[in-house]
Each structure stands twice: as C-alpha cells, then as structure tokens.
Amino acid sequence: MKTIILLGLLGATMSAPLIPQRLMSASNSNELLLNLNNAQLQPLPFQGPFNSWIPPFSGILQQQQQAQIPGLSQFSLSALDRFAGLFPNQTPFPGRVSFAQGTQVGQQDPSQPQTPPQTQQSPNHVMPYVFSFKMPQEQAQMLQYYPVYMLLPWEQSQQTAPQSPPQTGQQQFEEQMPFYTQFGYVPVQVEPVMPGGQQQLALDPVLGTAPETVVMPAGVIPYLRKEVINFKHANGGIFVPSTSQTPSTTNYFAPAIDPTITPELMEKKAKTDYLKEP
C-alpha cells in the first residue's frame, strides 16, 4: 500500500511543470507588443506555478533561446507594420482582407480576368495564413442576374390568363346592376347598346316597370313586366265572423273553393279519385 502511494506522489511530481515554458498565445499579444525592440522578439516572462520556487538557470535559458524556431524569433519590418496599428489581443488576419477582395471580384464583370491577391513574402519566408473566398464564375453570374422583383401568384395569373370572350349586352347589364335592386328599388339606368341597334330602356323609378314600347332583341327573355303582380289572395286564411244576430247556415269548416282553379283541373282530379277507388 505504501509503495502505491509513493508511486502516485512520484508521478504527480514528475508531471508537474518544474521548468516553465514560454507561452506564445493570442492572450499575450499585449506583452508581445511591449517587448518588441529593434525588430527583435524578446523572450516573454516565464509563467508557471513554481516560478517563485525555482531560481533562474542561465544555461537552460541560453539553450532555449538557441532552440527557438527561426521563423518566430525574428520579424522583418514589413511584418512589424501589421502589429503597429493594432490594439491588444488583436492579431492580423489576412483572410478578412482576401474575403472582401473576393466579394468585390465576384460583383465585377465575369468577362474581365480576375487577378489573384498577391501575398508579399518576407525575407525569412514567413507565409501568412491566406484563406481564399473566391466565388466561381457561375455563382458570380447568378448573383449578378438575381431577380429583385418577383411576380405574385395573382399578378402572374392576370398576365398569363387569356382574355375572356366579349359578353353579350344582357350579361353585361345583369353584372352592372347594383345589389340594392334586390330590395325593390330600381334606379334609372341606361342599358348598353344592343347588337340590333341603339335601344334605350327607361325604367320607372316608382313602380320599377318598363314601358311596352321597348323592343327586346330576339332570344332574350325580359325579366321586367308591365303589370304589377298582386300577391294578396281573396281567402288569405283569416276568418272574420259576421256580426248579424241571424244564424248562418254556412259551414265554416268546409274548405273554400279557389275560384282560380280551372274546370279542367277539377275534371282531372275527379278522374284520378275514381281510379283510386276499389
């Protein structure tokens, strides 16, 4: 059991960063800007959990300075110009510039030759990260001719639908009649010209009838009548008893014969009753 505990402690101490290493991350951009001197990148301060415990070793520092990558240890003046106008915690990203250039090239005429963005290489061959966002020529043409105004369904149907055949005068007159004629009021209105000649229909504003002098064309049934139809019936179902004191011998419960029924209908009814009897 003791050996297992000792091995655990030994592994924990071996895994601890006894020799702190240099941190080159984006969070140290402020220190990177402050430590630039004469176009040379100075070593950043050591960061680690045991900085206060371990004294500096000059031999190790010299070895670490010699073992630095040549591309990161020295920067040219052209590379330092990019860091000059930046705030802390910001690094140059050439991909954004190339993205803007790519969109501008896509909006230009596709017939013109497209020149790729030139990337300047520093003397120490430090290649910046360049992400090309160029659009192909087909997408550029599609964006250039993209329709701005789209036809709505009803507008498209109005444009593509064939014209309806010309309507007759009677149909036009029925369509032009307002809705309040259904309630009995017929205003004075002029009928459109008929094929047989110029005929004018003068309507009576009081009775809603038309004079007999109007001649309708052949095949058209007039819907206005001269005579006024009386819908009142003589025997409307209301019984008024007589006020005389003499008794009446009439049977009030007998059905009254409608005088409008013709004798032919009575004979036909009698024949059907005779045939129904056994």
UniProtKB/Swiss-Prot annotation:
Residues 107-123 have a biased composition (Low complexity). One of its GO terms (biological process) is positive regulation of gene expression. The keyword Transport does not apply. Glycans are attached at residues 103, 115, 119, 168, 246, 249-250, 272. Keywords: Biomineralization, Cytoplasm, Glycoprotein, Nucleus, Secreted, Signal. Residues 97-123 are annotated as: Disordered. GO terms for cellular component: cell periphery; cytoplasm; cytosol; extracellular space; mitotic spindle; nucleoplasm; nucleus; supramolecular fiber. Residues 1-15 form the signal peptide. It comes from the Eukaryota. Interacts (via C-terminus) with ARHGEF5. This is Odontogenic ameloblast-associated protein. The lineage of its organism: Eukaryota, Metazoa, Chordata, Craniata, Vertebrata. The gene is ODAM.
